[in-house]
Each structure stands twice: as C-alpha cells, then as structure tokens.
Amino acid sequence: MLVCFLFFYDKFPLLFLIIFHTKSLRKDFKFRYICFLMKKAVFSLLCISLGLHVHAQNTGKDIYRPEQEQINNLIDTKLDIKLNFDNQSIDGKEWLTLKPHFYPTDSLTLDAKNMLIHQISLVNNNGNTTPLQYDYDLNQQKLKIKLNKTYTRDQTYKIFIQYTAYPEGVPGRDKKYYSKDKGLYFINPQGKNSYIPTQAWTQGEPMDNSGWFPTIDSPNQKTTQEISLTVPKNFVTLSNGTLTSKIDNANGTRTDNWRQTQKHAPYLFFIGVGDFAVVEDQWKGRPVNYYVEPEYKSVAKEIFGKTPEMLTFFSEKFGYEYPWDKYSQMVVRDFVTGAMENTTAVSHSQTAQQKHGELVDKNVWEDVIAHELAHHWFGDLVTSESFANLTVNEGFANYSEYLWREHKYGKDYADELREEDLEDYFSGNNFHKDLVRFDYKKVGDMFDRVTYNKGGYILHMLRSYLGDDAFFESIKYFLNHHEYQKAEAQQLRLAFEHVTGKDLNWFFNQWFFGHGHPKINVVTEYKPNEVVVNLKQTQSPLFEFPLTIDVYENGKRTRHKVWVKKEPLNTFKFSTQGKAQLVVVDGINDIVVEFNEEKPVDLYVQQYLLCKDELPSRMQAIKKLAYNQLISKNALSTLITAMKDPSAGIRKLAIESLDVTDSVVQEQAEEALAKIAESDPKTLVRAEALKKLAQIDKDKKYLNLFKNALKSESFAVKGAAIDYLSQNAPEELDNLSEDLDIKLAVNSPRLLEKLIPQWRQENKINYFPELNEMAALYALMPYIKPEYAKASQMAFDWILSTNDLASTQAIAKVYSNYYKFMKENQKEAIPFLRAMANNALELKQKTYQQYPNDDLKKQIEVLEEVINEIKD
C-alpha cells in the first residue's frame, strides 16, 4: 500500500507526495507512499512565535507483537452482498470453508466489526444447514462460533453467516465520519453533493475488511474467493479475479459475480462501485483495464498506459511471470491512503487523475503505479506473515519504483528518487526503529519511512554487494518457494544464502533486525603522493559494510573497494601519482548512511565536474555550491554550468538554487535563464527558469516570452506565465480566467487572490477539492510559502463558512493525518495544529448559528472529533 500525504506537489515543496508505495506515508498521507516533511526550523519558529512548550518523546520496548496464532485456516470465502446506499449498510450472506491448522478444535473465532448477526449455520455436504451457537461481542469486534463437533486438521467444514454490516457504525452507536478503519466507504451515497460522484469502495489493509464481511482478518491467512455484488444498475463494479456473470434484476439493480481461484490474504479483498469510465487495455491476452471518472477517460492511458510494459518488465526482472488473471486499476474519491494493491483490482486516490497539461510535465503517479504492481509479487503472491515483517512487502514495492525508473529512464532519474526517499527517512524520527520490529504500539505505526524507504534501499545495498545476477536469482528463488504463502525476513535471508552460498546473518542482523544507520564524520587528508580517508562512526550501534572510495587524478577515477569495520574509527590510505584532485566517499552511492564532510568550494566544483556518472555526487555538489554563490565566483559559474546538465533534475535544482535577488547572480544567469525558459526540452525546467525570470524582470523585458509561455500545453509553464502576468500584465488574462482550470489557478497565488472572491460569489464549491488542503493549513503559509498566505486565508474563510460536509471532512482528514505524523516526528507542533483545527471549528459554529441545520451540525461534530483526537 502506498501511504502519502496528498499535498500540492511543486506548489508547496515542504508539503509533498511521497509515493509512498506508499501504499509512504503509501498508507496515510509513498505514496509519492509519499510523506509529510516539515523542517525543524519551521516548527521551531512556529513554537517560538506561539510560545509553545516542547515535550520530549518517551520510548520503550515493553511490547511484543507476534504473528497471529493460526487455529483455523481459511480455504474459501464466498460472499453474496447487497450495497444499501440509503443507509450506508451491507446485507450480506457468507459461506466460509475452513479447516484446523494443526490442533483439533471445536470452535471458530472471526473478526467482525460493526455488524448485526442474523444467523449462523453449519453447511453439510448435501447442502443442508444446522444452526450453530455463537456469541458476538460488538465491543471486541469478535464473533465466536461453537462448532457442531471437534474437527481435526484433515477435516474441512463450511459455515453460513447472514449479517448486516454498518461501516459507519451500528445504529444507536457513535458514527465514524472520517475514520480510516471502516473497511467499506460510501462516498456521497445519497447524491446530495453535486460535485462529488456517488461511489462505494473498500480498503482492507491493515485489518479492516472485517468491517464488511466476517473473516480471520490476519495477513497469515490465505483464501480463494467469490463475490456476488448487487448494486444499482447504472453503476460499474470491480472486484478481485474474473467477472463471471452479470444479471439484471427486476428491481433496477444488477448482480455481478467475481471469482478468484488463487488464494490471497483477506486484507486484499476489494469491491469498488460507482459511475466509472472503463478504458480497456491488455497484456498477453489478459485484461488490463483502467477505471476513472468519465472526465478523465481521454487521458486514462496517459496516466496508466505504461502498465503493460511494467508487467513485462517486472515479470522478467523477478524471474516469475505475473501470476494473476487480470490487472485492473480504479481511481476512487476521498481515498484514505495513496493506493492499495488489492489483488488484480488496485485502488488509487483521486490524485492519480491528472489533466493532460499536468501529464505533459510529469506523471506524478507513475512511481505509485509501479509500486502497486510490484506488490502483486511482494505482498499478494508472497505475503508478510505479520505486520512486524511488513518490509517484506513494502520494502520490495518501494525499491521496485527505483527499478522501474532505472529501466525506463536511466540511472540518474532512479537516483533522484533514491535521494528523495533517503532524505525523507533521515529527516524523520526513525533512527531508533528496527526495520523488522515486534514492539510497535499500533499496526499503523509500521507504515512509515523505515518500512518503506529504508527497507527499499537496504535491498539496493544487498544488490550492490551480491551483484545483479545473484540478487535477482535470489528473488526468483524466494518467490517460487513461497508462492501463495506467507513469509518473513528470515526466509528472505535464507533464499539469498541458498542462491549465493554466502552467510548473510551479519547483513540482516544489523540492517533488518537492528535499528539505525551509519552516521560518519569524514576527514580526508590530501598528501603529495597519498590520500588518507578517516571515517569516524558517531552513532550507536556501530556498523560494518563494504564501501567504495573514488580517487580522482588528472580527471581519471580509480575506484577502491574497502570494508568498514565495526570500529569507531576506520582509516584508509591510497597511493597517488601526485596530489589527488578529489576524493569521493561512497562513490557509487549505495549505502544507507549519513556523511558529515566539509570540503573547500573548489573541491565541490571538481566534484560536480568529475562525477559525470553519479547524480547524487553532482547533486550534493550543487547544494553545497548554492550556499557559496554570493562569495565565490567558481561556485556561481558552476551553478550556471549545471543549468545545462544532462539530467533534468540537476538542471532544475541548479536553477532553483540561484539567488537572483543578488545583482551579480542576475547579471551572470539572466541570459542562460532566458534561453532555458524558451527552449529546454523539459517543461518543469522551463517553468523553473520562468519563475526566476519573473523575479528579475521588473521592466517587462520578457513580457513576450511569458505571453508565449501562456500558449504552452504544460501546466507548469502556463502556471508560471499566469503568475507573472497576473502581476505585470493582468489584461492578458482577461479572456483566460473565465475558463481557467482550477489546477492551473492554484499555481498562481496572485490570481487566486483575485479569483477566490469571484468564485465565492458564484458559489463554485466544486473547486473546494483543490483548495481544501491549502485552506486547512492557512496558518502555516506565512512561514513556508508566504506568497500563498493571503489566498489560503481567503480559502479557509470561504470553505469553513459554507455548508459543505465533504470539504469539512477533507479538512478534518488533513488535520488527522498531520497529527499522526507529528506525534511521531514533531510533537512540538501539535498545539499549533490543534489551534488551526479550533479556528476551523469556531468558524463553522458561527455559520451554524446563522443557518442552523442538520448538515452543519454534523460538520461541527466532524471537527470536534478531530480536535479530540489531537493530543499532546
């Protein structure tokens, strides 16, 4: 699953997607996973300005979370369910086939959340039924069934359950307006909201599918399945496996039957229902379909069209052909995570739906698409036996994003992703967490940057250490020997050892079953005929690992392979013909490590110029040179040179790094910026150059350049032009602002300031989805993106003064997701978050006082619930 914070991508660089497989956070706020980063400096400033007290975080290891005991094993699950949109419930019939795991048993315990149980019977071989005694504890969410006799491990039995499930809460009990653990979610079920489609969809991971059918809701269970799904006739359905029949009913409904004959874990069950356009594709004769809102039908293949190529790539790379009968992907509204790898029926958040102009710039969801597909080997075919071992699923899926980029676009672009992921991991409060850990407080804690990012790039280290042939042969062995079964990290180790003949306990013990990573101070001594590299490990525990050290002489590189021992200080000496030009530690950038090293500016210049095939080294050099551009001519000239780098990522970084408020920088960079803004092959680079030119151009010298940019297909280029013209030539936008796509408008804070009052007057609440997050975080904008401060405040005032449940729920979800991140990583900021939520509540209460009605009362309850959730 990809956990991601659904933020504004390029608009707010401190608030961005992680893709994070994310299924990153992939499951809350990888994607990308993708995850929320807020720099400590920002929060320190907020806390000082608000006088907030900072609390220390207590940690302890007094919890043990074992794999769930297997008493009974699922064999087959058959469901006959009817969705009731009016009261948001399910009428269900279920036939479960099971057998004892080992010990004889006369009872069965199932997970069942928020249900009314009507009857339970044993189904005999002839189809007759015998009532069974049962006890349902609604508070414990357990259904305990007394079987008719004691069964042994070679005996199967089938039970029938008739039930009604209430994902929103059993009538008479508290409802969960924005809870993430319902299992089944009804979106705009009565169709009251004109701009939100009516849908129903499920999210099972970690253990939530027991919210819509009774099951043993544990990842170490595997079952085949059949689902008969009755829905309004005008809706499309999707579930796991093959659609075997569609029957129109006399009452205006239709029953679709889906069957999957290969077993998988209960959390991977999925149903999706709604008004979707279905765009058909195929791979080796198997259906590959894309379910999107009708508005996005024309771009569905732009978004998802690389899926067949990915299927071929991963099948070949993993040495195991894609095993399932189809591969469908559905984009759903108000998804509680980034994406989810439901077997053959992947669900994506609406962020996946992009306009053509956005896709011209970059398909921001491509990493997620690769991530979820890779899960069909790691997670669906072979499933981690417990959430303590979740990285067996998520580490591989996360690393598969890198593998896809490397294959399709080259190593530089893959290394950009690695740099982002590791920066994300290093920035969080992650050092003291074991990768495989049995002491998590809540299962949701496992869906973090350790499981995803660290787990993925530990695999990258293992690949580098063993070599490609051995690494991928080991993966093939692992998949073939554990197909349709559960597995844990120790079995992964054994697979690698079986193939390579190497003992890998040293690797797995420190990287999988231990915590942290090396933190190393580097001091390099350049001598006439020798270089001496001193590496001091400053962390505990100490690590051992192979390392490359590159020594450059006369423009040529010599790569040395050394072994860093578990010692505080490791010193390595290398002979040279004269004085070396440059030494780069970890030249191939394959270790999960934080280096602390300071070099003179001229050495960073050399690092950029000499490390032509190692993007991370060039990127590090650019970041260091940016700090010195105002005091070093060489630093500035190298930044300008980097604006022509073969890597678009480096070009964009170099442009972003320019301080064009300085007259010398302006003078030297202006001509190059103008050329790049006009003709760079990558629109995101052009857009960045336009933004810098906009800061320089006080006399409208480049007005025509910006007017021409307004004609671009690219949303990034067009957005940069709009922002410039809204300040310098607003008349150029007179004919544009009427039909301006909201996704373009949010690129321009100045234009938003003009348009939001107009939209408010015209009651264009259909724009709320693009404004909700900006509005929710209005109080942060003066600190992280000052130019959006006024527009975000205007959006906040408008949305919270409007009777709109969907937007209120969305804003509450923003606060909830931020809180989940902050309590682990930035506890000092929680009071500030609560203050924003309280302000939202106060404004909604004022609206209710003016226009009292049940909908506004419900919105107040939604905000009160999230405020109660936010604790110090």
Which residues are covered by each model-predicted region?
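Bacterial Sec-dependent N-terminal signal peptides
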Residues: M1-G60
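Acidic/His-enriched low-complexity segments
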Residues: A56-P323, R449, S464-L466, H482
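Non-catalytic accessory/interaction domains
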Residues: V231, K246, A374, H482-E671, ...
